[in-house]
């Protein structure tokens, strides 16, 4: 990740220069803004843990979904003249968002992201997950992705 929002220090002038958070974008707005910041400014990373992240914290915004009404899209962050790593990171952010949107029933939006960001070489697994999830009945998607994430989290913590 470019930035974990709870552990970021960004001057107000930088937020203002990149236009702040994208108005109307409910999912991925923070990542959208971090990408815009990293495109224009130097970003420093410290491997030292400076914040804790809780996987069990409640996320009220995840409880309901209504389609976004925004003029902003990760597609506009794609830059054919940028280094491959940059566009791969944009694809990663967009496909992660597409997974959430598909799980919540946004079939068309997720399919559009899968088509546009199908160029990814690094995040083929995420691309396949979006396509598979999108092919399932809507009522199956959220429980299935929840089960997948739960199992992946347990395996990562305890190993096989």
Positions of PLM-derived features:
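Conserved small-residue packing positions in alpha-helical repeats and bundles
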Residues: 98-99
């Amino acid at each position: 990740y470019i930035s974990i929002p709870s552990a970021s220090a960004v001057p107000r002038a930088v937020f203002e220069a990149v236009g702040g958070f994208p108005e109307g974008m409910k999912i991925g707005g923070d990542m959208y803004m971090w990408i815009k910041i990293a495109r224009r400014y130097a970003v420093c990373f410290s491997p030292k843990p400076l914040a804790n992240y809780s996987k069990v914290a409640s996320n009220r915004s995840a409880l309901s979904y209504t389609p976004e009404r925004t003029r902003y899209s990760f597609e506009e962050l794609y830059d054919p003249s940028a280094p491959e790593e940059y566009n791969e990171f944009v694809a990663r952010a967009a496909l992660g968002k597409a997974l959430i949107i598909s799980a919540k029933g946004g079939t068309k939006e997720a399919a559009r992201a899968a088509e546009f960001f199908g160029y990814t070489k690094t995040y083929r697994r995420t691309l396949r997950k979006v396509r598979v999830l999108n092919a399932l009945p809507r009522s199956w998607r959220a429980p299935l992705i929840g089960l997948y994430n739960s199992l992946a989290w347990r395996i990562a913590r305890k190993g096989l």
